[in-house]
A protein has these predicted regions:
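Sequence/structural segment immediately N-terminal to covalent heme-attachment motifs in c-type
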Residues: 274-300, 308-326
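Extracytoplasmic/periplasmic beta-strand context in beta-sandwich domains
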Residues: 190, 236-239, 305, 331, ...
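N-terminal secretory/membrane targeting signals
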Residues: 1-25
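Non-transmembrane, membrane-proximal soluble domains of secreted or membrane proteins
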Residues: 25-48, 69-279
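Alpha-helical transmembrane segments
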Residues: 57-73
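Detector for the c-type heme attachment site
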Residues: 226-230, 293-299, 325, 350-354
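Hydrophobic single transmembrane helices highlighted by the model
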Residues: 42-62
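Flexible coil segments in periplasmic/lumen-exposed cytochrome c-class electron-transfer proteins
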Residues: 256-277, 282, 286-287, 335-374
């Protein structure tokens, strides 16, 4: 193949790939549709910049092509030695920077307005959600209500086509309300990123970053962690369910009722059987602990200890309760005291003491946790 034929072939295949790409409606060429005023503004800014850049590109490539053909050496063209003395030659050096500056200021003008709004926290928020990133899940705390959502990625079998994009418990938010997000992390850097509804700031352990939005349209909006945070970085997707304020209130009432019932159940004096605790503990273990200790309890050698036959998980019950309740400083083992209630903690510990051949036969009761907390 000659050189020019080869170049043609490459260009043709590139064109074909681009055309084939546009055939998938969901994977359109542009960004997903923004559904909040501020994200709309950012989207428009992106479109403006892209249009300007495209026009400049066409003009510059046009001039270069024109010059290459028109003034080529093979035609015997000789460079004009006095071009810089002509009026156009003199002024072009001044005009081009002026035009560039004008374009820059056009973009900067809209960008400044968007940035000012990003940092505008003068309005009171209707809903405030603390968003906590951790390896590898998101936790949402509604600051004005006693609601806490732990959001884990759905496994492949349950997520289907939305694998890596679906979670068990989405964040539920009302439309048409000013929503304030407080971003932080419990271990390493993460970033909560849902481009359709809100811009992004880092989640930093020990710091709070603030963003806000006002969602205009009901729907399901997906995002992901946008700050590399370890081997599970790809496995902490985000799903936001935006619903009308009426539906949001109904959801909230239901959520509070369930939480109240769970709290009442957890603080009752009932003595639970081992099987009841084990059954509850299995689900809790798989959502909260298996990310590190693995579903089969074997852990990851050298990083996360296995619990199968572990000294703590099969030995002294108080030591087991202690490490789960208080964590271990300086390691990835977090304190679960504030995250799970007594019944949940009793269940997960009972599960660990009886699963995977850890047949201790122990049934740890909520009352044991209650006294250990003191
Ligand atoms: C982010 C990772 C991570 C998660 C999630 C996690 N652990 Fe751990 N866990 C660790 C690490 C690391 C250690 C080892 C700490 C040390 O160095 O002693 C540990 C130690 C333990 C031990 C002591 C094991 C032994 O033999 O030393 C128990 C018991 C335990 N975890 C229970 C749990 C329970 C119950 C949960 C869920 C509620 C949980 N862990 C969630 C990381 C994790
Ligand atoms: Cu992350």
């Amino acid at each position: 193949m000659s050189k020019s034929k080869m170049i043609l072939a490459v260009l043709a295949s590139l064109l074909l790939t681009t055309l084939a790409g546009t055939a998938y409606a969901d994977y359109a060429l542009n960004f997903p549709e923004p559904v909040a005023p501020l994200t709309q503004q950012m989207y428009d800014l992106h479109m403006l910049t892209t249009k300007i850049a495209t026009i400049i590109m066409v003009i510059v490539i046009g001039i270069v092509a024109f010059v290459l053909i028109k003034f080529r050496k093979s035609k015997g063209y000789e460079a004009d030695q006095n071009f810089h003395k002509s009026t156009f030659g003199t002024w072009s050096w001044t005009l081009v920077p002026i035009i560039v500056l004008g374009i820059d200021l056009t973009i900067a003008g809209s960008a400044t307005d968007a940035l000012q709004q990003v940092e505008d926290y003068s309005q009171k928020a209707d809903v405030t959600v603390k968003v906590i990133g951790s390896q590898w899940k998101w936790t949402y705390e509604y600051m004005d209500d006693d609601i806490r959502i732990v959001s884990n990625m759905l496994p492949k079998e349950e997520a289907g086509d939305n694998y890596l994009r679906a979670v068990d418990n989405p964040l539920v938010l009302p439309t048409g309300k000013r929503i304030r997000f407080l971003h932080t992390a419990s271990d390493v850097l993460h970033a909560w990123w849902v481009p359709q509804i809100v811009y992004k700031k880092d989640s930093i352990p020990g710091y709070i970053n603030e963003t806000w939005t006002n969602i205009q349209k009901e729907g399901t909006y997906r995002g992901q962690c946008a700050e590399i945070c370890g081997t599970g970085h790809a496995f902490m997707p985000i799903v936001v369910e935006a619903v009308s304020p009426e539906k949001y209130e109904a959801w909230k009432a239901e959520k509070l009722m369930v939480a109240e019932a769970a709290a009442a159940e957890a603080s009752s004096d009932k003595t639970w059987t081992k099987d009841e605790l084990y059954a509850r503990g299995e689900g809790l273990y798989n959502t909260n602990c298996s990310g590190c200790h693995q579903v089969n309890g074997t852990g990851m050698p050298g990083v996360f200890p296995g619990l199968v036959g572990s000294k703590i998980a099969t030995g002294d019950i108080d030591a087991h309760i202690n490490i789960v309740l208080n964590g271990k400083a300086g390691t990835a083992m977090a304190a679960w005291a504030a995250q799970l209630n007594d019944l949940e903690l009793a269940a997960v510990i009972t599960y660990e003491r009886n699963a995977w051949g850890n047949n201790t036969g122990d049934a740890v009761q909520p009352a044991d946790l209650k006294s250990a907390r003191k």
